[in-house]
Amino acid sequence: SELRVDKIHNEGGDNDSGIDLSTNDQIVLKTAATTRLTMNATGQTTIVGEGGSTTTSVQQGLAKMWVNYTGITTTAARDSLNLSSLTDSAAGQTLLNINNDMNNDDYSGYYYTNAHANTSYGNFDNVYAGGFGSFTTGQCGNNAYGSSGNVDSYNNFCGIFGDLA
């Protein structure tokens, strides 16, 4: 069976909250007569921010790939999203192979490493660092540096943001 309507609203309350289906090819969610969420025919979704005056694109704010991995003994992901594999390319250097490619190589991201072979999070002085080494649409590289050079690290956390292809 099928239900065909233009609007669903709160009949028992103040009558200014509900779902508006009357606009062309989009769904509009309103509360207190104000649009709070819009989803268009392509799935692009915008939502009103905390202050109520700005909107945020949900897709733009989501991580497109993230991974928690170890580089000790055998480089392996503990958990991930949109990651097809990891490649141990050298001591302290790992290539992250993205399952669904990015739209271009200008995306942004974060990378944390403890730059140590144990589970410690205490290596925060200036001789320990981690960063991105390369960006392509299907891959990014991480590099972990310890006090004596590149080092395979136990704790590595990486995420990237941007548009998928």
Regions flagged by a language model, labelled:
Residues 1-78:
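Intrinsic low-complexity, repeat-rich intrinsically disordered segments enriched
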Residues 63-165:
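Extracellular attachment/recognition segments
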